[in-house]
């Protein structure tokens, strides 16, 4: 009898798993879940811990044993999705960026989105001009250390904080100048609100880049934003497709297709190649979820989507959450006393924070920021200002950032991040999908921009300009096989987008090294 009880107790313990979720302020939340617990259960625990009601904008990220990143699906078992050995480690992050973050109902929600965008700025995912970078950093200073105080803030105080992958002494002085003269008296909530209003106007607001190749083998980054689908190449946003122009998303193996219907009933198919079939499926699922969230009027309109054609076996997926319009309507009905916000102050540091796969010590949730170590490539870039209208290819190089190797103030064993006035690639940031160590080197090759601003229809006219034999050889056998010619009817023509022409590059393959952020 006793042995049966002990055996049952043992089996019960085996069905419990420890989960650690890294929060946006770098603290950690640890809990225990049952073997059959769904993702929704874990997410609800987190939102209760954070006192968060406007929770539809957020999600939980994890990396599987093959180093592929995923968003946790709330309708499926947590344990079965992770497929790794416990204890499990995940991250709480913004999944759907609010189209207007300043319009969020509660301050706690705005604060969490502020923390996410601050991370995007630091990791190089949010790109901006030098003047905008200085203003954003000054808002962060005001929100987290308060008014300038000569007694507390000596000369060069802004240099002790890390806002970007790289920054220069000139930029540090500009940040301090704005903080001293323009922001005095602003509360943390006001500074965070102003930060959100400014960030929302930037071209790469909400961008979570997926590294791919176009049909010519050029590195590209695909992303989904509140406003539509974007393609980044080099230091430019080369294409933008509004959500109401996207008619279908599909993938087959490593090939991703985006179907576009624009004016005059022209139907176009954009084709890109992901590093792995798993990465392509992740890209497709992200696209399906973003399109449903931002485009649909109500969640009852959501349909199960197939990844392939009707007569071929493919993946099926259905977005399970509410859509943006429903979330806004629900938020308007929130009536409660504003929850207390435990803000995490900045920790002065001259080294880059890092997100690693190594074990972490447990901490009390929402405690002070931790210093972490991250390997980030150089610089920030400038993207041309845009009103989120038509897809374009730009040759503008105005007001950009320069990657600087080291500041004169740096110690011999200390790497200091610097920004000045040149350009950098999104590959320099911590990417959300697997990228080989060698592929970063390939992506960082300098780009040569040619051609004037053009629409997607104009791209069709340039389709005939195929790569030379030498360029095709450099791309390698795998890409040549993928890029064999595609046919199409008169009413539906497949268009291979060829963004800015790059210098000749050699195909180096893709790896699976990815940090958990």
Curated annotation (Swiss-Prot):
Keyword tags: Cell junction, Phosphoprotein
Pfam families in the cross-refs: FA, FERM_C, FERM_M, FERM_N
GO cellular component terms, A-Z: adherens junction; cytoskeleton
Top-level taxon in the UniProt lineage: Eukaryota
Gene3D superfamilies tied to this protein: 1.20.80.10, Phosphatidylinositol 3-kinase Catalytic Subunit, Chain A, domain 1 (3.10.20.90), Pleckstrin-homology domain (PH domain)/Phosphotyrosine-binding domain (PTB) (2.30.29.30)
Ranges for region Disordered: 344-367, 385-408, 485-517
GO molecular function: cytoskeletal protein binding
Residue span of region Interaction with ROCK1: 308-353
Location of the FERM domain: 17-298
Signal peptide span: none
Chain positions found as Phosphoserine: 375
Compartment annotation: Cell junction, Adherens junction
Biased composition (Low complexity): 498-517
UniProt-listed InterPro entries: Band_41_domain, Ez/rad/moesin-like, FA, FERM/acyl-CoA-bd_prot_sf, FERM_2, FERM_central, FERM_CS, FERM_domain
Ranges of Polar residues composition bias in the record: 388-398
Keyword Phosphoprotein listed: yes
Quaternary assembly: Interacts with CTNND1, ITGB5 (via cytoplasmic domain) and ROCK1.
Function (record text): May be involved in regulation of cell migration. May regulate cell-matrix interactions via its interaction with ITGB5 and modifying ITGB5 cytoplasmic tail interactions such as with FERMT2 and TLN1. May regulate ROCK1 kinase activity possibly involved in regulation of actin stress fiber formation.
Name the record gives this protein: FERM domain-containing protein 5
Organism: Mus musculus
Gene responsible for this protein: Frmd5
